[in-house]
Structures are given as C-alpha cells and as structure tokens.
C-alpha cells in the first residue's frame, strides 16, 4: 500500500519539478530574480529512507525520538503518510479555496494544492498506530440476497381440500356458538329482570309481615298487662260502692269545713264545731217538715207553675212589643219636631229682613 501510494506522488513531484524549473527559467530570462527551491521537491531523493522510517513508526510501539537528536526525521518524514492521503483525495479537493493563510507558499505549488493531511498523532502519546485495513468493495450484485434454491415440499390437493372443509366447519360452528351465546345472554337478562322483580315483591311482603308481626307482639304485651291489672283490681271492685259512699261524705264534709262561714254578726255560744252540730240538727228537722208538707200540695203547685210560666211568656212578649212601639214613637216624635222646626225657621226668615238673617248665619265682619 505504501509503495502504491508513493508512486503517483513521485510522478507528480517530477512533473511539478519540471514545471517549476521551467517557470524559474522564464523568471530568470524576464527579470533575474532569485528563486528559492521548494523542499517538497526533494521527496524523490529520500524515497527509500522515508518508506523505511514510516514503516518503523507505524509498526513499532516505542516513542518517537525527540527533535534535534541524531537521526530523527524532520517534517519531511511525514510525506509518505501525506502521499497516502493525497492518493485517495477526489478532484474537487484540489481547489485552491480550501487553503488558509497558514499554508506556506514555498512548500505548495499550483499543481499540488490539496487538503491538509489528517495526521495521526497517537505516536506522540505513546500509542501504537494501527494499520487501517481496507474494506472489500461490495458490488450491487453481491448486495442482492441469495435465493433459497432448496426444493419446496408441495402439499397434496386432498390435504388442502380437507383443511378447507375443516376451516369451513369451524367457522360455521363458531358462528353458531356466537348466535347461541347471544340467545342465551338475552334469556339470562330476561330471567335476571324477572328475578329482580320477584325479589322486590318478596321484600315488600316481608316488610309488611314484619310490621304486622310487631303490631301483634305489641297487642299481646298490652293484653297481658291488662289481664294482670284485672287480676290485681278484682278484689277492689267489691269495695268500690262503700268507698264511693265514704268518699262523697268525705267530700261534703271537706267542702263544709274548708270554707269558713261569715259569722261576724252572729253570736255563737261555745265551740264552733258544737254550733255546727246543732245547726245540722235543726236543718234535718226543717228538711223532714218540708218533706211532710210538699206531697199534699204538689199537684196544686204543678198547675200554678204552668200558669205562672205561661204568664211569664206573655209578659216577655208584651215587653218586647212595648219596647218596639216605644222606639217607633220616639222616631216619629223626632221627625215631627224636625219638621216643625224647619217650618218655623222658614216663616221667621220670610218675615225678617235679609240683613238680620245675614247676622244670624254669618260673622258680622263680613261685608
């Protein structure tokens, strides 16, 4: 690779040297100015030494000797590496627009304007340079995938027909299963709705029965309590009548003794209780006498009572009629007096003068 990369560089260097010598001769003939030869033209003389030095730097893993020591290669020792890169540079890279001001005019000619070499400086950092192995060029024919030339085992037609029939049967069965499943789902939904309705009805009946049961239990408890009260109060019923009589006598005695009588102007001899006892005896005597007198005159008193009642009704009616007639008489007298006063006023106004009438009805200050 190194020899192949150096060979074209050498030819180009010779051509460039020839061209540069011709230019120098023209310049001498024109003006006689001093021409400095380029060091780049000396690459052909030290071909063998440079190749051997490049091989040693690439293959060996040792350090590069320091600059200034004996036998160290100078900047020109990198020419083989530059030659390798320039061999693969395309034609558009030879344009002069890619160079910068840092490029020396003495080292480059018009025919050798190329891009800067990509220098590998791993040797300076004690690293071995690995030789880049070229990759084989892959053509378009090689990129095409290779077809499998193995023979394909063909399936017999009977097997294909059998598989098709089985697939048809399976599809039919799946469709039928789906239809049956859909029908069963609808039936299950209807059954669930019916079950829910029945559940609601049963819950309502259960609530009604629970309420009736609680009412019955409460009635039974009340009945038991009433029976127990009857059992306890039955002996009291026999003593109810004497208790009632005793209670009435006690109430009357309490009423008579609770309120004090107005005895302010009554002379009482002795104790008050003794006076009440004597008074009670006298009242009992008067009661017996009245009972003896009343039966003989009861019929007469009833007849007289009826007549007195009728007379009372007649008196009430006459009283009402008299009150009504009296009101009517008062209204009539009021109207008569009013009419008489109006007539007398009219007669007086007619007989008297207007000035006098004006004084009667109006203030004297008015004109």
From Swiss-Prot:
Transmembrane segments annotated in the record for this chain: none
One Gene Ontology term, aspect cellular component: mitotic spindle microtubule
GO biological process, one term: cell division
Region annotation (Disordered) ranges: 1-35, 54-81
Subcellular location(s) per record: Cytoplasm; Cytoplasm, Cytoskeleton, Microtubule organizing center, Centrosome; Cytoplasm, Cytoskeleton, Spindle; Cytoplasm, Cytoskeleton, Spindle pole
Keyword terms, alphabetized: Cell cycle, Cell division, Coiled coil, Cytoplasm, Cytoskeleton, Microtubule, Mitosis
Coiled-coil blocks: 183-221
Keyword Cytoplasm found: yes
Subunit: Component of the HAUS augmin-like complex. The complex interacts with the gamma-tubulin ring complex and this interaction is required for spindle assembly. Associates with microtubules. The interaction with microtubules is strong during mitosis, while it is weak or absent during interphase. It is unclear whether this interaction is direct or indirect.
Family per similarity comment: Belongs to the HAUS8 family.
Function: Contributes to mitotic spindle assembly, maintenance of centrosome integrity and completion of cytokinesis as part of the HAUS augmin-like complex.
Protein name (database record): HAUS augmin-like complex subunit 8
């Amino acid at each position: 690779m190194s020899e192949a990369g150096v060979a074209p560089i050498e030819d180009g260097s010779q051509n460039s040297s020839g061209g540069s010598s011709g230019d120098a001769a023209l310049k001498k003939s024109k003006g006689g100015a001093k021409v400095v030869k380029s060091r780049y033209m000396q690459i052909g003389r030290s071909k063998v030494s440079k190749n051997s030095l490049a091989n040693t730097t690439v293959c060996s893993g040792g350090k590069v000797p320091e600059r200034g020591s004996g036998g160290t290669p100078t900047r020109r020792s990198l020419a083989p590496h530059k030659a390798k890169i320039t061999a693969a540079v395309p034609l558009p890279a030879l344009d002069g627009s890619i160079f910068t001001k840092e490029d020396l005019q003495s080292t480059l000619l018009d025919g050798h304007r190329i891009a800067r070499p990509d220098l590998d400086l791993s040797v300076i950092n004690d690293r071995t340079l690995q030789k880049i192995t070229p990759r084989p060029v892959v053509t378009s024919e090689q990129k095409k995938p290779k077809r499998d030339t193995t023979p394909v085992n063909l399936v017999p037609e009977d097997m294909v027909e059998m598989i098709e029939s089985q697939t048809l049967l399976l599809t039919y069965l799946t469709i039928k299963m789906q239809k049956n499943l859909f029908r069963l789902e609808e039936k299950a939904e209807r059954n669930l709705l019916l079950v829910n309705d029945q559940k609601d009805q049963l819950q309502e009946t259960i609530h009604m029965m629970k309420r009736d049961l609680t009412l019955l239990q409460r009635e039974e408890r009340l009945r038991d309590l009433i029976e127990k009260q009857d059992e306890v109060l039955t002996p009291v019923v026999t003593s109810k009548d004497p208790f009632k009589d005793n209670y009435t006598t006690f109430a009357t005695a309490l009423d008579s003794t609770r309120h004090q009588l107005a005895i302010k102007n009554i002379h009482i001899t002795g104790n008050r209780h003794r006076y009440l006892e004597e008074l009670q005896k006298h009242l009992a005597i008067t009661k017996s006498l009245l009972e003896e007198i009343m039966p003989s005159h009861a019929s007469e008193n009833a007849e007289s009572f009826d007549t007195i009642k009728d007379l009372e009704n007649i008196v009430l009616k006459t009283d009402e009629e008299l009150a009504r007639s009296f009101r009517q008489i008062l209204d009539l007298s009021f109207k008569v007096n009013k009419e008489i006063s109006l007539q007398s006023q009219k007669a007086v106004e007619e007989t008297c003068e207007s000035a006098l009438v004006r004084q009667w009805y109006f203030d004297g200050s008015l004109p």
